A protein has these predicted regions:
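Alpha-helical linker/hinge and terminal dimerization helices associated
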Residues: 28, 32-35, 70, 113-132, ...
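Charged, amphipathic alpha-helical coiled-coil/dimerization segments
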Residues: 3-6, 82-140
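C-terminal regulatory/oligomerization modules of transcriptional regulators
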Residues: 1-12, 135-157
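N-terminal positioning helix adjacent to the helix-turn-helix/winged-helix DNA-binding module
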Residues: 17, 45-47, 109, 137
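Short, hydrophobic-biased segments on the C-terminal half of alpha helices
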Residues: 63, 81-82
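N-terminal helix-turn-helix DNA-binding core of bacterial DNA-binding proteins
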Residues: 30-75
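N-terminal leader segment of winged-helix/HTH proteins
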Residues: 1-40
């Protein structure tokens, strides 16, 4: 699709807005991924897992909940957790007597990796995203994206 308007055109089509959103989010993710690899030695998917665990109560999550929060398929999550377990960043443990339910638990080493990577990630986000728009625009984006995300989370795909 070829753009026929400027970003200030009030009647941009949903397709044009989607294209801008999609391209920007892909570009920003690539920049964050590159910075994490260069400065921390790991990638954005691993950072996403570390973030979910670092923000969880007791630094642990049930694997199903971790997959939901990171938007990973169970097989992709399992592969990534295996990589991270080898680095000593986390452990996968059975939950009590239920051998079918497993948790991922963040280790001190994993928390340290997260804390240094969070600084790198936030620097890129500030430079390429938050620092480029007004607080009013950021608030509007949050309202729109939160509403859309909430709808998707309720929808079974």
């Amino acid at each position: 699709m070829v753009r026929t308007d400027s970003p200030d055109t009030p009647d941009a089509t949903p397709e044009e807005i989607w294209e801008d959103f999609f391209k920007f989010s892909q570009m920003l993710n690539l920049e964050i991924d590159y910075a994490l690899k260069e400065q921390c030695g790991f990638d954005l998917p691993q950072y996403s897992i570390l973030t979910a665990l670092a923000n969880a109560p007791e630094k642990k999550l049930q694997l199903g909940e971790l997959a939901r929060q990171t938007v990973f398929s169970p097989s992709r999550l399992n592969y990534r957790l295996g990589e991270m377990e080898k680095k000593g960043w986390l452990n996968r443990l059975c939950q009590g007597s239920d051998k079918r339910t497993r948790n991922a638990c963040l280790s001190t080493k994993g928390l340290n990796a997260y804390e240094s990577a969070a600084q790198v990630q936030m620097k890129v986000v500030r430079e390429l995203f938050a620092g480029r728009v007004s607080q009013s625009d950021l608030n509007a984006m949050r309202r729109v994206l939160s509403s859309m995300r909430s709808h998707l989370e309720k929808t079974e795909l």
